[in-house]
Design a protein with these regions (language model features):
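Sec/Tat signal peptide C-region and signal peptidase I cleavage site
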Residues: 19-23
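Bacterial N-terminal signal peptides that target proteins for export
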Residues: 1-8
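Bacterial N-terminal signal peptides
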Residues: 9-16
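Lectin-like carbohydrate-binding module/patch detector with strong preference for beta-trefoil
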Residues: 24-192
């Protein structure tokens, strides 16, 4: 009886350790990343003018395809530190857009689900949807049950050749509001 008890204790400890190791962040806050559709190795998620996210040819000179990945309580925010923009799930139009980083916008949070062939990107606030890359290169949010069976829902996240710019940690920071009696001021700090 004592041997079974010890065996179960050791087994429980091993399972607990494995969960803790696997739950640790795998994205370095001081690096930039490119997000590739799994079947298209020379195109990455980026944006031009406006708010639509498009596939662009990989280029280290294009800052609008470089993403810093911030972990926030098990979810992730993809932030372009050069323009302080984040990927956002527009669930009403089932589209992927970029908007200014907003710490209270849950539509900017993503679940990154690992598979053997890549990752799947699921909006954290709408887990019934999943990001897919259509054959024509359009990116859209689709019903998760349908998308999970499609290769179009697989993406690769790779470290970019572009280094993180100095001071970018401050640019990616959410806006801070300070209370001054009945007034609120944005970034009420010296030099702002």
């Amino acid at each position: 009886m004592m041997k079974i008890y010890r065996f179960l204790m050791v087994l429980g400890l091993l399972v607990w350790m494995a969960q803790n190791v696997s739950s640790q962040s795998r994205y370095d806050k001081d690096k930039l990343y490119n997000v590739f559709p799994a079947k298209v190795s020379n195109k990455v998620l980026g944006y031009d003018k406006g708010s639509s996210v498009i596939l662009k040819s990989l280029s280290k000179d294009d800052q609008k395809q470089q993403w810093n990945i911030n972990e926030l309580s098990g979810s992730f925010r993809f932030v372009n530190v050069f323009e302080d923009k984040a990927l956002r799930a527009d669930v009403d139009h089932k589209a992927l857009v970029v908007t200014e980083v907003n710490g209270s916008d849950e539509a900017q949070l993503w679940s990154i689900q690992e598979t053997t062939n890549g990752v799947r990107l699921v909006p954290a606030n709408t887990p019934s949807l999943m990001l897919v890359c259509q054959k024509d290169g359009r990116l859209q949010l689709m019903d998760r049950k349908k998308a999970e069976a499609m290769e179009a829902s697989l993406f690769q996240i790779r470290v970019s050749a572009v280094p993180m710019p100095e001071g970018a940690g401050m640019a990616a920071r959410e806006k801070v509001y300070w209370e001054d009696e009945t007034r609120f001021e944005e970034n009420k700090e010296v030099g702002h």
